From Swiss-Prot:
Keywords: NAD, Oxidoreductase, Tricarboxylic acid cycle. The keyword Thylakoid does not apply. GO terms for biological process: lactate metabolic process; tricarboxylic acid cycle. Substrate binds at R86, R92, N124, R155. It comes from Sorangium cellulosum (strain So ce56). Belongs to the LDH/MDH superfamily. MDH type 3 family. Its EC number is 1.1.1.37. Catalyzes the reversible oxidation of malate to oxaloacetate. NAD(+) binds at G11, A12, G13, N14, I15, G16, D35, N99, I122, S123, N124. This is Malate dehydrogenase. The active site is at H179. It catalyses: (S)-malate + NAD(+) = oxaloacetate + NADH + H(+).
Length: 313
């Protein structure tokens, strides 16, 4: 009898709980909901609630709350949400000093117990945290990625659909660059059922949608007092599903660049083919001069925060 897949979720907070619920409903595998020892009972309680939910919704996934890395051993996918979420007035980069020790601890546990897992980092600032995770573990770049572009593109996709008054299902959007205020929505790559979005939406309105996309996470923080969790969880699950089922979806993720787009030794949002081997190909899009300029600005921001991480190691 084949072994069931195991997905380990590091952090049992808002995103961790929603991740567990989505993974269980999709029957992608059994779930380990991991948190620090002080929150062991919280993780166990959330796991029990989710398992009981399975009796209502009809899924059979095992969901275990724990603070022991031994329970994560051999995980097929590791999704890292551990860290302090943003509060109103904070940027993602403000979290680096707080979350860096946390990501290092997680990296050490993963290296020992989950050496063959695909790793998806959600903890902010994503581009810096995923860089440190890869640096500390030495995992191959094909199996270490940050969740950013899927979420940012989804936000852009929604705003485009609302502006054009069309179904969000017909909109395809792409956001590259760092997961911050300098992210790069790519108008030339946006289509509405094959029609360029630029033909249906004026440049003035498109620029306003781009600005809102860049501040999309901050808008939610201001409204809720904490970071988003439904859409981020769905974005990470889409990535995990493409890997586990070898779907080979083209998704924008924070990937380690080694010359692609002209950048080296940084993680930044780019389109990739994500399949059973992890990142199987980085897709280099033809960009307009304006888009290249915006990407360079974003890369400079990412490099700055990455240099802070390098200096502290």
């Amino acid at each position: 009898m084949a072994n069931r897949r195991k997905i380990a979720l590091i952090g049992a907070g808002n995103i961790g709980g929603e991740l567990a619920a989505l993974i269980a409903r999709k029957e992608l595998g059994d779930v380990v909901l991991f948190d620090i020892p002080q929150k062991t009972d919280f993780a166990k309680g959330k796991a029990l609630d989710l398992e009981q939910n399975g009796a209502v919704l009809g899924y059979d996934a095992s969901i275990k709350g724990t603070s022991s890395w031994a329970d994560c051993a051999g995980a097929d996918v590791l999704i890292v949400t551990a860290g302090i979420p943003r509060k109103p007035g904070q940027s993602r980069d403000d979290l680096v000093a707080t979350n860096l020790p946390i990501i290092r601890s997680v990296a050490d546990g993963a290296k020992e117990h989950c050496p063959n897992a695909l790793v998806i980092v959600i903890s902010n600032p994503i581009d810096a945290m995923v860089y440190e995770f890869k640096r500390r573990t030495g995992f191959p770049r094909e199996r270490v990625l940050g969740m950013a572009g899927v979420l940012d593109s989804a936000r852009f996709q929604l705003f485009l659909a609302r502006e054009a008054n069309v179904s969000v299902k017909d909109v395809r959007a792409m956001v590259l660059g760092g997961h911050g205020d300098d992210m790069v929505p790519i108008p030339s790559a946006c289509t509405i059922n094959g029609v360029r979005a630029t033909e249906l939406i004026s440049k003035e309105k498109l620029d306003a949608l781009i600005a809102r996309t860049r501040k999309g996470g901050g808008e939610i923080v201001q409204l809720m007092g904490t970071s988003a969790y439904y859409a981020p969880a769905s974005s990470a699950v889409a990535m995990a599903e493409s890997y586990l089922l070898d779907q080979k979806r083209l998704l924008p993720v924070a990937a380690y660049l080694d010359g692609e787009y002209g950048y080296k030794d940084i993680f930044m949002g780019v389109p990739v083919i994500l399949g059973g081997k992890g990142i199987e190909k980085i897709v280099e899009l033809p960009l307009t001069a304006e888009e290249k300029e915006m990407l360079a600005k974003s890369a400079k921001s990412v490099q700055g925060i990455t240099d802070v991480v390098k200096a502290s190691s």
